[in-house]
């Protein structure tokens, strides 16, 4: 679990995000609601071939699960050794990548059998992960997003995320949608839509009130998890130990508030 110092930093960052934004802000409407296990401490999340793929965290509880959206039925599950705190996941061809918070190991699995096929190492912390057609994009809790070579996991380039002149840190779970990077901000109810070219925040999605406070397990049950169904243009969001996954539509943006 993140330290108390990190939590305080995240809360300060969330307050700054709420008060110092320059980009326009969108709201949402709920289209549908799907079941989600409150045992799942969501760190990675994507939709592919009609299924939800999820990477969960916490030492001794980290796993990869493949579930049926409508029922929440688990079709596959792979627990990882208890010394690892699982973080972001992404698909790449026939494989699935999962990296770890502070162990500096990225596991590569066969996506269909969840059998490990290789490992990569890296420096720094592992948080969120997504992909373009050619690169893997990662976050590490700072304001920097790194673009990596899928064949080596080495950094190719990076961008610093800013809203106006303000750096936006605590970048967490990621999703690449229609040429933009969507990023959860740890301990914030907002998602940033980020330009992959220069890192500027294009707009915000304010998801305040999506899950009532009395349905959250604890203070760490925060918004974290973005998935996109490209074929049907559907956007899904969830959070750590949330009882539901929400399909949402984004409303037109308004001026910053």
Where are these regions (language model features)?
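Short loop/turn segments that connect beta-strands within beta-propeller blades
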Residues: 67-72, 110-114, 150-153, 195-199, ...
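Blade-loop segments of beta-propeller domains
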Residues: 71-109, 114-126
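A short helix->beta-strand "capping" segment at the edge of beta-propeller domains
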Residues: 23-39, 69-73
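Conserved beta-strand positions in repeat-built beta-propeller and related beta-rich domains
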Residues: 53-58, 96-103, 138-142, 183-187, ...
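Surface-exposed loop and turn segments in beta-propeller and other repeat-based domains
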Residues: 32-34, 75, 79-82, 158-167, ...
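Beta-rich, blade/repeat-based domains predominating
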Residues: 38-49, 82-93, 122-135, 165-179, ...
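Hydrophobic, well-structured mid-protein blocks that either form specific transmembrane helices
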Residues: 106-164
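Beta-strand-rich domains and repeat architectures in extracellular enzymes and scaffolds
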Residues: 31-63, 78-90, 239-241
